[in-house]
Swiss-Prot record:
Keyword DNA-binding annotated: yes
Keyword set, alphabetical order: DNA-binding
Highest taxon in the source lineage: Eukaryota
Acidic residues composition bias: residue spans: 11-21
Protein name: UPF0746 protein DDB_G0281301
Domain called SAP: residue spans: 35-69
Source species: Dictyostelium discoideum
GO molecular function, one term: DNA binding
UniProt family annotation: Belongs to the UPF0746 family.
Amino acid sequence: MVNNKRKEIENQENDNNDDNDGLLTYKKFKEDINYDSIRSKELQTIAKSLGLPIIGKKQEIYKRIEGYFLSKKVKSDLINSTTNQLQQQPQQPQQQRYVLLIKDVDQLEIYFWKAFRNMIIFKNIFSNFKSKQFGYHDLIGINENFLKSYSNSLEIIKDNIKGNINHQIIRSVNDILNIIKTLKKKDNETISFYNTLFSAFSSTTTQSIKSLIFQFDENIDLWIQRMILNENLVALDQFIKFFKINSDVLKKSIEMHINPSFFNVVTYNNLKIYNYLKSINAIPTSHIKQRFSNIDLSDSLSFDCKLKRLIKSYKLLVDPTNFKKIQEIHQQEEEEQKQQKLNSDKDYIEKLNQLILELSEIESIHFTNDQLNSTIKNLLNQTTTTTTTTTTTTTTTTPILITNNNNSGDIKDIIKKYYKSIYLFFKIIKEGNLYNRNLMKPIHYYLYFKKEKSLIQLYEIFCGKNYTHYLIFFKSILMDQNLEKNQILELVSNILDIENGVPFQNIGCIYNFNLRSFNSFCKVVFSINDTELIDHLIKTIKKLQLVYDSKTKFPSISEIISTNFQYINKNEIVDFFFENYRNETTLFDDQNQNWYNGHVNIIDHYEKLMESIEKRLRLNIVYYYDWFTNVNKINEKKYNINILLDQLKRAISKPLLYSFFNDSGYYYNKLLIIFGWSLENGNEFLINNILSNEQFKQPFRFSEIIDSVLPPNKMSNSVKLIFNNISKESIESKLYQVKVKFNFSYVHGYYYDDFIPLTSTISTTTTTTTTNSEEVGQFIIGETKSFDFTISPRILFVCLYYLDRVDDIFYLFDKIPEIFNSGYFSNFTQESYLYNICSSYYLGLFINYFIENLNDNTINHLYTCLCVASRKGFIQIFQDILSSNKNSQYLLKVRTKTNQSSLFQSNLLCDMVVNSINSSNFQLSNLLIDFIDFSPKNEKVLRSKIFKSSNNK
């Protein structure tokens, strides 16, 4: 039976060439093969005859075969369409076949691209550029970091596709998946990119089909699934258009691969995908959205989002036709359950219907582009000047009318209707409740639309048992409403005085002061940077400390000022503290450590005040480091390391004003990190002073410092600053001393340990604003000083590598070959380390050096380098080896009893190939398997690994 079915399918497949109707094959499969009656083994036989995997459950194999015929139908349609288009096009003369689409191109630009594309000229021109550590050919594979780190990542991929450069960037299906997961922005560049991608990897490509690693139209259904599940609308839309996929194929693919519950999840991108598919009639009946789960539209409902995002979210969610079906479900449930409690939902439905009707009369064209691209918060806070005289100016908040339709009402009322409609919808579908973080109304909704809520009620909602959004709460009510000064002053009093300070008492334990809440409140008040407001806060707290001392224990005024000084950015507030609260705060005490602030103007002004009263500041490296990192962590900002480095530079440059507190080992660890940041940012002045300043005299261990700033692409110049005066001969002498002392047999317990002492010199070239030598810590501009440090062999070699001094490494190996016998160089050449730092250019140099200097130890290093090249996908390295008959015979042939000239046994070469397979470098994998003389058994195992790995991606 099964053989007959298989022959029918194969015959039908051949007949396709005559009638060009792939759908007949699919229909034949559906008609002749009944899922319930056919056995798994029969399906496996059919799958095998079609060249499909036979592993899996019965349902998986069935869907695999079904998807195969769907893809054949799409491919057949695409080829027929392309053929018809070509036949309909009139024949063009040969000289008119290629037309330059961009007109008026400058002649110099044409010459430039001719030279740029000519590899011989290109290499000759750029041969003088010494930085060979990283280049275009080192970009292997695609991941999220690659796509986001390179601003021209799309152009790099497109250039790679057009040039067919060894498939080094797109090596497998997994690389395409990473693209789909990441590139979702709808713009002309992304659309053009996806069209290029689909064209390059399809049956219509101009490349040889055999050279393709895969074809999109071989697995149409699976790619539809992947784009939907990754919520990539722009890729899905272009995919459907490029391959001319009709709604029947889409429906069948969704039925086969998408769980109906996927569309019940409600996110902005999920709604966009669902409504798009619905608009092209591609949603199967079984997948029509009827229930809602895991709703998260918090980003779209934030008052910081743009108006057009809110309108789009409303249209995606409260779709009138979809809402009509929900009403029908509601009525059906009411009839079945006959419960009175559903009557309340009727009111919600009636209200929502009315709002839908009102909002349907307001189209987006009634809003200006400025309004659509403004945030909700800005629109609601917008003010206009209504009265202006020679003596006074009155500014009042006014309704903002929609410019194109004065009957539509003010924008505040319209925005409220959008929000109200969405939250009514949540109530109707039984998903909204007060304690659902993703569904609760944002605090701004209450501030703008629900003003009847009291302050204490709002606090209980947003800062009560379930939420601790203190900072968001206080910032929203004090800073986001565009309030007048007197209103803010009144709010501060009310917050402090609510039921004897309830906002600052822990719920359920009234005597336990809530410091987090209070600190958040003070942070917001100080961040407003208004002298009157801060003074009002301090005076009000003083009164409350007397009145409510037994119930609410507020911190001291000194602690409040010191803790929040970091949020001050106006000099007049510093003067205010100096003149009015000098005796109530430690901020102006001698040797105090409460002055930390990230604003240069504040520090500069504060320093002058301290000098005027002849007081000094103390800089505790540990405290300052911890403060800096914690502030950035709280603010969720990326560290601006230069703020910390510049402050240290100021302090070191002013020894009469600053004293340093050094806390032994803990201090040393922090200083190492700071030194690493200095290296990374090329802060030459700070490096000079740390290394030469007596206050920081330490036996610097450079291994830890440099290791903290890897990888190399940011530190080459900084390492050069340290090593510029250290010759290979001086390094050789130090290594020789170590050899005599230890004979490279003494192995430290941890390979980071430094034991090679080196001496370097640094010249101060950085200028300063003062000529007073005391102001730069006795370090005279232009003077050269030496300093000693220790370094491990591994990091020594790393530094030489970063400085493009690989020849010096080889020189040291030649002079002191015993270094190969130690456990130290192997740490440099171990696979995990080389993988992280080594480019294809330098890896090739290492391989060639080891080939020319073969011995028992270098063979191990050679094998490690080959494994790294295999894992990274540096196919050119292996092609160079294969081009040399001598090298290929003993490097890439199996060592056996009869072939002792080869270096590596079968298991080692197998592992090398597996490295390339595991990193999806399948083209390299096949190249190696084709050349290496593996046994039939090993070859079968390796090819099976390739098949499984490529199909699992």
